[in-house]
Amino acid sequence: MSKVWLITGAGRGLGVDIANAALEAGHNVVATGRNTDRVARALGKSADLLVVKLDITKPTDAESAVKASVDKFGRIDVLVNNAANFYAGFFEELLPEQMERQLSTSLVGPMNVTRAVLPVMRKQRSGLIITISSTAGLIGFEFGTAYAASKFGVEGWTCFRHPS
């Protein structure tokens, strides 16, 4: 049975690979990104594909993307929280705005999308949420303070989200 996959950050890198793999396996895909032209160019056209604008830092965008997904395909079976960014540098040289953007995109963003998807999955009484993290969430690295902080947060959030 085909599933409906909602994938964030589907305009490049791993997001493109995940979306293509799901499409090739016969699933329906809602591919999201801030730049829908980039997402559409990366994935091409398919009756099984819906491209939706989504800035994961905006809860209203997440709600709209979920609504568009359900309107088109009737359900969401798999959420892949893939979108992220990366600010590198010595901690004291990173601007406060860069730290905020890093945490907003890589930590709060997946929370926004998951919060919007959960009511759909609870109503269906099924669903799978995959949140892409990094080894930076387990062990920090030079010049990666902002990124590691966001990924340590993701690791903690996903560990304690499971029972609820």
Predicted regions located by residue number:
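The beta1-alpha1 cofactor-binding region of Rossmann-like NAD(H)/NADP(H)-dependent oxidoreductases
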Residues: 54-64, 96-97
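Active-site helix of classical SDR
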Residues: 114, 150
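Active-site loop immediately N-terminal to the catalytic Tyr-X3-Lys motif
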Residues: 92, 139-146
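Residue(s) in the substrate-gating loop at a strand-loop-helix junction
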Residues: 134
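Substrate-binding pocket helix/loop in short-chain dehydrogenase/reductase
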Residues: 90-91, 95-100
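Conserved glycine-rich Rossmann-like NAD(P)H-binding loop of the short-chain dehydrogenase/reductase
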Residues: 25-40
